[in-house]
Amino acid sequence: MKSLILDIPQLKKFADDKRHQETLWSDGHARISLICMKPGQEIVTHTHHGSHIWMVMEGRGNFLTGGKAQVIEVGQVVVVPALEDHGIQNLSAENLVIASITAGGD
């Protein structure tokens, strides 16, 4: 496998009806995805066996876990351990872009 540089601003894509999520790279052990959300879109709270690292690249949103919401914004990184409930809402008036690294599990 060769090294790869991902240009996040060039890879952003949005959909009107729901969030746009696209896998940018995967090697069977880990993957990098780009999550693009217009205002009002969300990822419903859920769990799975893999861990996430979410890096907020643009905008701000509400990170949901344990029945609570916490504002996240550009420059912040969210670490979600495997089997922890998590979701995100874009309740702002601007687009939200998150680079997601997932390792282990599904």
Predicted segments with their positions:
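Short beta-strand His + acidic residue motifs that chelate non-heme Fe in jelly-roll/DSBH
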Residues: I43-T45, F63-L64, V80, H86-S92
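Short, charged/polar surface micro-motifs in flexible loops or helix N-caps
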Residues: G28-A30, P39-Q41, R60, G104-D106
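A short hydrophobic beta-strand segment most commonly corresponding to one strand
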Residues: E94-D106
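A short, N-terminal "cap"/entry segment at the start of jelly-roll beta-barrel domains
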Residues: M1-H29, V78
